[in-house]
Amino acid sequence: MQSEIITQKNGKGIFDRKAWLTESKKLYLSAKLLRSEGERNKKLLRAASKKSPIVHEYIDIASATDQTSRLMLGYAFEMLLKSAILLMNLGARKKAIENEFCNYGHKLNCMAVDLGLPLTVDELKLLKVASRDIVLNARYPIGIVDDNKYITELNERNIQLADENIFRDMVSLYDKIKSIVAKFDNDVANCANFNMLRLSEFTLFMRNGGGLSSRAIVIFSDKFPEVSKRKSYLKKAIEEHAGK
C-alpha cells in the first residue's frame, strides 16, 4: 500500500498551509506585543531610582522581552516560509515533506532562495540572523566557560538582541515576505497550473506558475525497481505516453 498523499491544497494538521499561516501570524503579533512591553519597561527603568527594589525586575523584563520577541519573530518567519514550501510540494507524500523540512532545519535564507523570493542580499543576511536567533542566540545559554570571554559574548548578544533597528527591519521583512507568499496561487494575473499523469509504474504531479518555481514530483509504485528510478526513464515514459 502506498503512503498517503497529504499535500493537497486542503491538507490537514501540520500539512494544512492555512494552519501554518495562522500560527505564523500569532507568533508575529506576540513578538511585536512583547517588544512593546519591553520598551515600556525600559522607560520605567530609566525613570526609576537606582535604589528602588523594583529596578531589578524592570531589567529582567527588558532582557526577557528582547530575547523572546526575537525568538518568536524567528519562528514566525519559519512558519511563513514553510507554508509556501508546502504549496511548492503539492502532491508529495508525508515522509517526503517531513524530510524536506528536516533538511531545511531552521535555515530561513535557504527556504527563501528555493522559493525564489525577490530579496536583497541584506534581507537574506537578516534571515540568517533570525535563523541564529532560533538555533542559539535567543534560545540557549552561552556555551563559553572562560569568564572574560563569557562576559564579552554575553554583552554582545544582549546588545544585538536589544537593537531596535534590527527588530524593525525584521518586522518590515516579515511584512514583505508575507505579501509575496499571500499571492502564491492567488494572483489572477499569474495563475498556477496543476497537472497529473498517472501510469501503472508511477504518478507524476506537475505545477508551474502561481508565483512559485515549476516543480515535478514523482511517486513510484511500491514494486518499481530502484535501478530504474532515473530521469531518463521518466523522460522516455512521458514521451511514449504523449505520443499515444
Residue ranges and their predicted role:
Residues 1-32, 89-244:
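Long, charged low-complexity segments
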Residues 1-69:
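Charged alpha-helical initiation segments
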Residues 41-42, 85-91:
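Surface-exposed helix-capping loop/turn segments at secondary-structure junctions
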Residues 32, 64-88:
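Short, hydrophobic, well-ordered secondary-structure elements
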